[in-house]
Amino acid sequence: MAKISCSSFFVLMLVFSVFSLVEKAKGDERCTIIIHPGSPCDPSDCVQYCYAEYNGVGKCIASKPGRSANCMCTYNC
């Protein structure tokens, strides 16, 4: 009887661990927002504003070659 209880315990722990990992993965979603879309991007301002407002990472990225860069902020949703 002890062998059945021990193996059942380990199976339940394995199932519980898998569900815990799945829930954690769902919570790690990342969002992206364009900050001040019409304004030219200053890299230092972009980084500081994104971190202060969203606790994220800001980068100046041009949507197409030849266009001015926009401040793209990536943060946890």
From Swiss-Prot:
Residues 1-27 form the signal peptide. Disulfide bonds join 31-77, 41-60, 46-71, 50-73. InterPro entries: DEFL. GO terms for cellular component: extracellular region. It is found in: Secreted. It comes from the Eukaryota. Its main location: secreted. GO terms for biological process: defense response to fungus; killing of cells of another organism. Keywords: Antimicrobial, Disulfide bond, Fungicide, Plant defense, Secreted, Signal. Belongs to the DEFL family. PANTHER family: DEFENSIN-LIKE PROTEIN 155-RELATED, DEFENSIN-LIKE PROTEIN 184-RELATED. This is Putative defensin-like protein 157. The lineage of its organism: Eukaryota, Viridiplantae, Streptophyta, Embryophyta, Tracheophyta.
